[in-house]
Amino acid sequence: MGKIKELQTSLANKIAAGEVVERPSSVVKELLENAIDAGATEISIEVEESGVQSIRVVDNGSGIEAEDLGLVFHRHATSKLDQDEDLFHIRTLGFRGEALASISSVAKVTLKTCTDNANGNEIYVENGEILNHKPAKAKKGTDILVESLFYNTPARLKYIKSLYTELGKITDIVNRMAMSHPDIRIALISDGKTMLSTNGSGRTNEVMAEIYGMKVARDLVHISGDTSDYHIEGFVAKPEHSRSNKHYISIFINGRYIKNFMLNKAILEGYHTLLTIGRFPICYINIEMDPILVDVNVHPTKLEVRLSKEEQLYQLIVSKIQEAFKDRILIPKNNLDYVPKKNKVLHSFEQQKIEFEQRQNTENNQEKTFSSEESNSKPFMEENQNDEIVIKEDSYNPFVTKTSESLIADDESSGYNNTREKDEDYFKKQQEILQEMDQTFDSNDGTTVQNYENKASDDYYDVNDIKGTKSKDPKRRIPYMEIVGQVHGTYIIAQNEFGMYMIDQHAAQERIKYEYFRDKIGEVTNEVQDLLIPLTFHFSKDEQLVIDQYKNELQQVGIMLEHFGGHDYIVSSYPVWFPKDEVEEIIKDMIELILEEKKVDIKKLREDVAIMMSCKKSIKANHYLQKHEMSDLIDQLREAEDPFTCPHGRPIIINFSKYELEKLFKRVM
């Protein structure tokens, strides 16, 4: 008798569920995608005990026809594909027809649905079998309740992480879906507490403000770009809001959240020299393309995709992020540990309302506003390497929604309002800001957040407010300031009417020299300095093999290396712009870079060499400067292409506004 037999449907579904339904967040993702595909404009997600006890998703989409209800829980039953060719033109989020079958095999599922001009129906499924199917009262759309997840697979239930971890993963999925579909009102409720609620205005930056808070939202920069095959749209946060992991990078293709190593790399390349090693940006990028250019049928979770013309897309993302920050003021503000008190308005108006301008006019041109509300000061959840939850008072968590940053302090405080009431210039400035915000909200030039970022912030005078966030004259990106002195022979202290500045002198000169060497290395020049006595270098046999392979690349950075016999090589000339006293050391370092990498990208080699040379030739710490030398250094920095970070991504200038200094000395409360 044969040993091979076809598996029972219930067993096959449980096996399939192992990939599709890994945890409660997988269920939320699949049901949310179904609701979006059904054309819903309002979706509510309610979970109890982080989805382990129950998950309920209610939408106002098209609903399911009565005759289709018997099929929706069958494997590979779907309304989204009909023939082979459809697999290459997928625009829906779901298409495999596996989700409901997999979910119903490991949970108890009740589904109510109603279409236009039809009576409602209810179906109950347990262990993959339909136990009840009857008419029922239901609103248009679908209401699906998933209970007792993994009740019949105890091994899977055993390995569910803590409730905090699972809730965090659910919130993460919903947050990303909300960002990619801002036109849908999405609410997430956990054990009766609202975790997220979007207004469906169609503005992604409003959703990001709801998720990441107003402080980040003020510093979002809009990006947009096209090629013949791709269109990208999104928001990138200023480098000062960088995080310690890649979790805050959100990439979507045709509205689908995906993970892709090359696109992550493109985003980091766009932030090149603006972020230090180990820091990652907050950003949202949606890529629109013909579905034929992307294969989403790689894995049942549909997170992995394969792209055509990936290099073209890579370059588009890099260039648009670089353009976004090219002429922008990126002086980070000092981060004071300041928590506002309740019931007292910091500014002269009762409650700041910030309205995000739509990138394009909506059809009804209905005015939407986003109100800043009081944020809660509470511990955030943080997950360690063992998936255990660690409570930290001051850590940031993407899973915790912050409607806005608080602008409110205690009525009983004194001194601050009295000071401000006497300051007519302050009120004049605030009025100008409000008028500018109003003009921004009423206009439709498509620039969104960048038109008002940093306006009406909880700082006193701030150069970012006065100069604007995008300078028409690149030389004015660094404000004019008076040199006051130097601290520890390392930091230059300067001031102007808006506050105090600290400048890292080594980082400043490193940026200046980096741009000089980078440009020189990239030039093709015949201007060389001949050596009376050639420099001689000795290499082992294996090193010789690498060097011989990359002789042309060395020539492109100005090093003419000639084999002199045996293990010896000579250099008889060098570019005139090489620092004369360091020629031999520079050449050694260049060759070592090649020997370490064992492969060479000429662009990266030029970059690494420029960074290396700039670091060695720059002013070191504990080096005291004359006042005119400090002033000259700031003037040179003002001419730099990117004057705010050193080549390694560390900040060059930090700004303390006048108000922040007053807070430090308790002159204001």
Swiss-Prot record:
Gene3D superfamilies, per the entry: 3.30.230.10, Histidine kinase-like ATPase, C-terminal domain, MutL, C-terminal domain, dimerisation subdomain, MutL, C-terminal domain, regulatory subdomain
GO CC annotations, alphabetized: mismatch repair complex
Molecular function GO terms recorded: ATP binding; ATP hydrolysis activity; ATP-dependent DNA damage sensor activity; mismatched DNA binding
Keywords: DNA damage, DNA repair
Region (Disordered): 356-382
Pfam families (UniProt xref): DNA_mis_repair (PF01119), HATPase_c_3 (PF13589), MutL_C (PF08676)
Biased composition (Polar residues): 361-378
A Gene Ontology BP annotation from the UniProt entry: mismatch repair
InterPro entries assigned: DNA_mismatch_repair_CS, DNA_mismatch_repair_MutL, DNA_mismatch_S5_2-like, HATPase_C_sf, MutL/Mlh/PMS, MutL/Mlh/Pms-like, MutL_C, MutL_C_dimsub
Described purpose of this protein according to its UniProt entry: This protein is involved in the repair of mismatches in DNA. It is required for dam-dependent methyl-directed DNA mismatch repair. May act as a 'molecular matchmaker', a protein that promotes the formation of a stable complex between two or more DNA-binding proteins in an ATP-dependent manner without itself being part of a final effector complex.
HAMAP family in the cross-refs: DNA_mis_repair
Family as reported in the entry's similarity comment: Belongs to the DNA mismatch repair MutL/HexB family.
Listed name of the protein: DNA mismatch repair protein MutL
